[in-house]
Each structure stands twice: as structure tokens, then as C-alpha cells.
């Protein structure tokens, strides 16, 4: 599927000033915004992103949108700008509810607060009639997981895309988050698609997508930028961009569009380049039975036949000594005993010091849920517990965990 192109840089051409509220500007320039979407549809886009990228409850509250009723009315008005374009073109095009990182201007947000924000945001987008939800330009595992968990409550498909540097880390990076760790964790949790956006037209971007494809069980998204730096000048033209999109399709991208600096001419060129050559990527899956676990920083590949875990750690507020000591051992997995929700929260405060994958053991269903919810990665669950197997499987599926 072909996605649309840039929003903010195109709005800027129409008079929007960077630094102001993009959403408030859109609502005062409805005809121009809808016409931009119509242009993307005519250029071949099969999905358009509603102009809700920075429309979180926190951001809109700064402009007097400070009640639930006002918020949902505003989101509905914004989504209608995209929906009106679809109706005007009588097109079979999906409307994607767009969500952004929330830490850019709110660095002190906890994971729990982010989860509340994305839950409310996703609910408003779903009620406004979006077909799909996306959280894009994401910069940390915490944000990605909060957006996915909040979005899945609506029952709509949820896509996640991150922006990456040349080292395969998300940017701006708050916690050395690995793009590959995001893929493994999020697809296990039920993300419907994952990928990259606002990355440059470069060989490294294409190679990164190819590496993701090796471990992807879900569709991959690629929405590269044609500029470096917000509000910068175009560095690549439409023809070069289209050729790059063709290369991304060769690497296995399933959904392709453009980010900053790409206008409808770029999307049209990409459409012609991709669909005229009938590119079809054949997925190949590895026969390996390796278990893949992750924290926010790295992946861990384990053979299910020979996993040795440490004696279960007891949770407390400071686990630094215990976790650091494990680095000099031959254990494959850190076993963590979770007796209560307090244990789950205590370990969450210490997990950044764990350089091995984690296995939670608990006889308490709610405590186990809390531990998996708070853990920023893909964990393992010890099957030797008092929780019924059917319930354990339900918990593992929700949080993307591996039962062992």
C-alpha cells in the first residue's frame, strides 16, 4: 500500500508557522488542508494520515481544549478534514489517526502517564471514525508500548513507526532504545505493522529495513524524509525519492510513503516507480526455534533446550548490586520473583541495570500482569507457577511474553 507524504512541511508552504499549533492552524484552513489530502489521494495514496500528529490531550489543553467534550469535538473536526477528502474523491482510502511522541515537550512524563495520554488520544481518534491508528516518529520503548497498549483498547489496528539514527537507535534517544528491540517487543504484543519514518534517503535506511525484515512477522512501514532537519530544504528530488521507494519495496517494505519534504509529486512518482514494476517481495522465514527476548537496548537469542536462569531475585528498591553481579556469571536469564505489584514496580525502577533477559516468576496473577506491563521489552514467564495455564497464556499474549 502507498501512504501519503508530508504534512507539516506542506502546511508550512500554505502559511503555517513552525512552533504554533498545527492543529489549530488546520481548523482555520480547512479547505487548504482537505485539498492537500485530495492531492495525495489523486497521486495514488491508499492511506492518509489525519492532521492529529501533535493533538495529544496535553498539547491541546494549552489552547483551551481542556475538557473531554471539547477534546473529542476537536479531534473529530480534525479527522473530518481527511475523511472529507476521501469522500470528495470517492476513493477507497483509509484514514489513519496519527499520534506523536509526547516526551518532546514533557520530558518528565512517566510510563503510566503516557499510557493514560495515549489511551485517551486513541479513544478520541477511534470515536472520530479513523480506520487505523499510528504512533509515528517514536523515540523510546516506553512511548511505543504506551501507544500500542492504549491504541489496542479501541479494537482498531495499530501501527508504530520510529525514527532511527545510523546506529539503529531511536532518535532523540532517551534510553538507548534499539529499533530492532522495538520490532521484536511490539510485534509480540500485537502491533499490526512496524517501521521507520522521518529517516533519510540513504543506503543505511534501506539496509536497516532489510534487517528488520529478517525478524518481522508483521507488515513493515517505510516513510522516509526528503530533508534533513525540521523545516530544512529538500535534499532529494521526486525522481530520486521514487527510486529509493522502489529500493525499499525490494527490501520488503509493505507500506511506503513520505515524510518531511515530500509533496504529492513525490507520492505520484513513488506510485509509478513501485506499481509499474509490479514489485512482489517473497518473505522467507527462518526455521530456527530460537527464542528471542529483548530489553529496550538489545536482543537476546536463546536456545529453548539449554536455558539456565539464576536463583530467583527478590525485588527491592535498590537491586544494583544483585544485577551487576550477574554480569560476571554464565546464566542465560535473570529470574525475578514477583510476589506483589510493589515488587513489579520495584523491579521496573531497576531494570535498566539488567544486561541479561528477564524471566518473571509469580503465583499472583495481578502481580505478574503488573511486572509485564512495566517491563520495557519482551520477557519470559516461568511456567512453574500456580496460575492456570489458560490464564497464563492470555497474559503472555497481551504483553508479548514467552512462557518457558
Placement of each model-derived feature along the sequence:
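Domain-level signal for soluble alpha/beta catalytic cores
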Residues: 1-404
Amino acid at each position: 500500500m502507498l501512504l501519503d507524504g508530508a504534512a507539516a512541511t506542506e502546511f508550512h508552504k500554505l502559511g503555517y508557522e513552525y512552533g504554533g499549533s498545527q492543529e489549530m492552524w488546520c481548523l482555520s484552513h480547512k479547505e487548504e488542508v482537505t485539498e492537500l489530502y485530495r492531492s495525495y489521494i489523486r497521486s495514488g495514496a491508499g492511506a492518509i494520515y489525519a492532521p492529529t500528529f501533535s493533538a495529544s490531550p496535553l498539547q491541546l489543553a494549552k489552547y483551551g481544549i481542556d475538557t473531554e467534550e471539547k477534546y473529542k469535538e476537536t479531534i473529530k473536526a480534525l479527522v473530518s478534514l481527511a475523511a472529507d477528502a476521501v469522500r470528495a474523491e470517492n476513493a477507497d482510502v483509509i484514514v489513519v489517526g496519527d499520534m506523536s511522541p509526547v516526551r518532546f515537550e514533557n520530558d518528565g512524563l512517566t510510563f503510566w502517564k503516557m499510557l493514560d495520554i495515549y489511551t485517551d488520544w486513541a479513544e478520541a481518534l477511534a470515536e472520530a471514525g479513523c480506520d487505523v491508528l499510528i504512533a509515528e516518529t517514536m523515540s523510546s520503548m516506553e512511548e511505543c508500548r504506551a501507544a500500542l497498549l492504549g491504541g489496542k483498547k479501541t479494537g482498531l489496528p495499530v501501527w508504530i513507526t520510529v525514527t532511527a539514527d545510523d546506529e539503529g537507535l531511536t532518535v532523540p534517544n532517551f534510553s538507548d532504545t534499539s529499533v530492532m528491540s522495538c520490532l521484536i517487543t511490539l510485534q509480540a504484543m500485537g502491533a499490526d505493522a512496524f517501521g521507520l519514518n522521518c529517516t533519510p534517503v540513504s543506503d543505511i535506511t534501506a539496509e536497516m529495513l532489510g534487517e528488520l525484515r529478517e525478524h518481522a512477522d508483521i507488515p513493515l512501514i517505510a516513510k522516509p524524509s526528503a530533508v534533513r532537519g525540521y523545516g530544512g530544504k529538500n535534499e532529494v528530488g521526486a525522481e530520486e525519492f521514487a527510486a529509493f521507494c522502489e529500493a525499499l519495496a525490494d527490501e520488503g517494505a509493505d507500506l511506503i510513503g513520505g515524510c518531511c519534504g515530500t509533496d504529492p509529486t513525490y507520492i505520484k512518482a513513488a506510485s509509478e516507480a513501485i506499481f509499474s514494476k509490479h514489485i512482489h517481495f517473497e518473505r522467507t522465514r527462518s526455521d530456527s526455534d530460537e527464542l528471542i527476548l529483548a530489553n529496550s537496548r538489545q536482543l537476546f537469542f536463546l536456545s529453548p533446550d539449554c536455558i539456565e536462569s539464576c536463583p530467583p531475585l527478590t525485588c527491592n528498591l535498590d537491586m544494583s548490586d544483585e544485577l551487576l553481579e550477574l554480569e560476571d556469571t554464565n546464566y542465560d536469564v535473570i529470574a525475578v520473583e514477583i510476589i506483589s505489584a510493589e515488587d513489579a514496580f520495584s523491579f521496573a525502577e531497576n531494570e535498566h541495570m539488567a544486561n541479561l533477559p528477564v524471566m518473571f516468576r509469580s503465583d499472583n496473577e495481578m502481580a505478574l500482569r503488573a511486572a509485564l506491563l512495566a517491563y520495557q521489552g519482551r520477557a519470559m514467564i516461568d511456567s512453574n507457577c500456580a496460575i492456570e495455564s489458560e490464564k497464563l497464556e492470555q497474559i503472555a499474549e497481551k504483553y508479548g511474553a514467552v512462557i518457558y
